[in-house]
Amino acid sequence: MKADESLEQIFKVQAGKLEESYARLKQVMPSYFFKSVSTEDLAAILPMAAELENKSGIQMIERPDRILMVYLKSETCNPVCTSRFFAGKRILRSIIHESAPLDGSGGIIVIEQITKDVPGPEMKPLFSSGQIEAEYRKFYERLPENLKETAESICWRDVEDLDLERIAKRLRLVCEVRKRDYSLTEIENVGGNEYRITMAVAVVARSEGYYAQTLEQLEASGFKVTRSYLRNFTAGGAPDDFRRKAVRVNTYYIVPVKPGADAPEKMINLKRELNELAWSPQFDLFERELLVRNEFCCASVNLLRAASEFVHSQLSFVDRNAYSLPEIQRFMATYPAVLRRLADAFESKFHPDGPSLDFGKAIQEVREEIANINSGMAEKDAKVKVVLSSVTDFICCILKSNYYSEKKTALAFGLDPAFMRHYESISESYGKAFPPERPYGVFFFWRRNVSGFQIRFSEIARGGWRTVAPKPVKSLLESGDSFEQARSELFRECFVLANTQHKKNKDIYEGGSKLVTLLKVTGEFDFKTELWAAQRAVFEAFLQLVNYGADGKLRDGKIVDFTNRADIIEIGPDENMSDEMISWMGDRAGEDGYTLGSGVISGKVDTGINHKHYGVTSFGVFQYLLRTLQYLKINPAHDDFSIKLSGGPYGDVAGNMIKLLNAEDGTGGYRMPGLRIVAVTDGPAAIFDPAGIDRRELSRLVHSANLDSFDPAKLRGEGAFMIFNQPDGDSRYPMASVSGGKLRRAMIARDDFMRMFQANICHEADVFIPCGGRPQTINAGNYGLYAPDGKPSSKAIVEGANSFITPEARLALQKLGVVIVKDSSANKCGVITSSYEILSGLLLDKNEFSAIHPKLVVEIMDRLAFCARREAEWLFHEFELRRSVPMTELSDQLADRINEYKQQLFTMLDSHPELVTDGVIFAHLPPLFRKKFADRLHRIPPVYRKAIAAVELSLRIVFRKKLSLEEDVRQIVSSIG
């Protein structure tokens, strides 16, 4: 009886607590709470809400389809904090209820109802595409071209509670976001002081953490969220279907909690802030210290994040250990007042409506404030001053930015290259890290997990776009090492490649440039999806800064431009650039009215000259190889000789080089019957065979598979081996080798694998042709491995890959007797092809280009052979005359001389426009244009005509006896007619 009485008493007490809990909620919770909560949920909420003051933390119940939370609001318990719980969960909707202040304590009860997005069967469409179209027409005059296909991809299970009108209105945002890469936000007043925010974002742009970040931004802007709905509105197509992306539509109902938070100007800024969340980092130091603690806006925080990344890219060449990115960001966040003044100065200078403060005065005050920093720790203060002064210099060197653009996918900055002087003043080591020439222009790009540079050395310039995406390793302790190394080298890699490209471009009217982006692979999506999303985002941002109208002004009126010039940029394909992306970029530039239209990028499959298909780069390298063999007194048609390669059969340059080396003579034999390819080093595998790697097996893989698909059973020579970059769970790597005439297999340790992999290019051969691999693979610190005991492992190197060998290593190897044909000479034919492709696009319509494509390719290949052989003959002739001058130096001298003439003539022709004749232009073009399209030269922009004349005349001057410059030009023009 006593037990029963005790239980009855417990039940009575608990029932009383539930009644008290209900009575209190009835008193303090908004009426909407009781309308929206089910009896089942209320039964779960009441016990959690009872005596809440005596409970710590968050009371939570999680069910398969929902989550319920009850807590007293505090700094550590609030909707922003709880939203982080959902980073790995699929949430369909969230309703947040806040009570009135409690009597006595003033505390606020928060009750959250979270509905999970539980997988279920597909629903039949609630409305037909015809019904949706008819409803859409009620509100909007113009139908999006993709409305029907977008309506047909609606995820009906996620929108079943929406009526036809709301579906139609949301489709206006969804249709635009689906084919572009920015997010769109609309803010509407729905009565009183309540607002509805509708945000459409491509799922590929953000997944985990987006909801939490949105709540955090809204709180920082002075609002609280009362309820939210998160819907997967449309399903997406394949990863390469860039115009049919899955789109999520999130809706938030908010009310201001800070006076003036909903002022018109602040609501405009809020819209821009929310749009930026799709590509902003989450939960980092700047978010905590600047956005949350110091109430910076998201746009300002992103500006400062970009600044920290840029400063790190430069200070890496001052002292890499002292100025790591975390240290730079820590030093910056320690002085929020300085950062706010810098952000305010930047925002004033680039505000579309004009400045609101004196930029020069503001910067001077910031510099004085930095100079007066004194924490009592002199060594630390010195570093802080370097970092903050570098951030200040970055702000001062910005000439244009898409910061105020409403529809952006990344931050883009056009910079004054004078920023390099700032770092040279800090340390001499900075200047020594780069070639002596300084760029004409620099662009910098930044977004979540992506940063990059585009550097050019002349007004009109072209060069490839490569994306560096270090592959994460399994070891947690080492997973970020390769990325951090690439991050520290990003600016130098781009600079050196652009400088090399400038020397390489001596045969064409464009100077040299390079675009290099660094992607941090997260694994959140598959690699191609992450890669393509990053490339699209950077391209969209880049296009905003170079897309000028006929009036010479940027088409985006939100961008203030201090360059006083209309930049024209040309891009070419490079590492990690796919045909799908090339086509998309060309189409996008054409849609937005870019000066060159689809000519912004070369290498398009349908309207271009695909480098990989025609092997144009390798074709040029091959011409230099033939001349090198001649110098070595090797007749490839009869003599035995050996070659080693870096790069694999699937790649452009290496694959096509293998194709040329293994070309047959028409009778079943090889044109080079005595050739042995003794070593090939590719990312997935490396092979060494002293008897020569099986040529037919190697040819089988060309452009169809990577080197790891080579059949190890084809290894022949004693000591031959093949190692695979396929580690198991114990970091051991597969190896096949020939020993005692038998093929043996084993697993080797990582250290042994790396030693063999790195040393594979050091096996003896007559000629080494690097056709792939990372820049600076052979450098001042390791060139001795290539030449053990001072004996080089090859007689010559023909550089098919850019910057594979550092300048210091080149000189050291040449002193040991290695003949090196520099990259800027050897692999220039790819960019020559791209230049002709762009000119063809200007002169011809698409159907005309297609009609003459086969004949045009033949004429361009003839031109490539002429350009390569002419320079090769000049180099070897000069090399034999001037033995004391390394061939790489001769290559630089030739490029510098031609480029110097190009610049002089480009300027001189302003005063002598009569020298820019049609005859000179036609002399530079393939003969087909004079024969069939002689009336098209007016399509070439005047500045391009002048540049074409400058390069054609420069080449003819350099390769003939020199008179006075003007006399030489007049004689050449006269001879051309």
For each of these PLM feature ranges, what is it?
Residues 195, 463-476, 596-610, 728-739, ...:
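Gly-rich Lys/Arg/Thr-decorated short loops/hinges at beta-loop-alpha junctions or inter-strand turns
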Residues 133-150, 527, 540-550, 699-743:
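Low-complexity, serine/threonine/proline-enriched polar segments
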Residues 226-230, 285, 318-322, 504-510, ...:
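Flexible, glycine/charged-enriched surface loops at secondary-structure junctions
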Residues 496, 525, 626-644, 667-675, ...:
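Non-transmembrane, aqueous-exposed alpha-helical and coiled segments at domain scale
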Residues 1-440, 445-454, 468-487, 530, ...:
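Non-catalytic interaction/regulatory segments
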Residues 599-697, 701:
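Hydrophobic, well-ordered beta-alpha structural blocks that scaffold small-molecule cofactor pockets
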Residues 298-306, 310, 415-419, 437-464, ...:
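Conserved phosphate/anionic-ligand binding catalytic regions in large, soluble enzymes, centered on
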Residues 494-641, 681:
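Glycine/serine-rich phosphate-binding loop and adjoining beta1-alpha1 elements at the start
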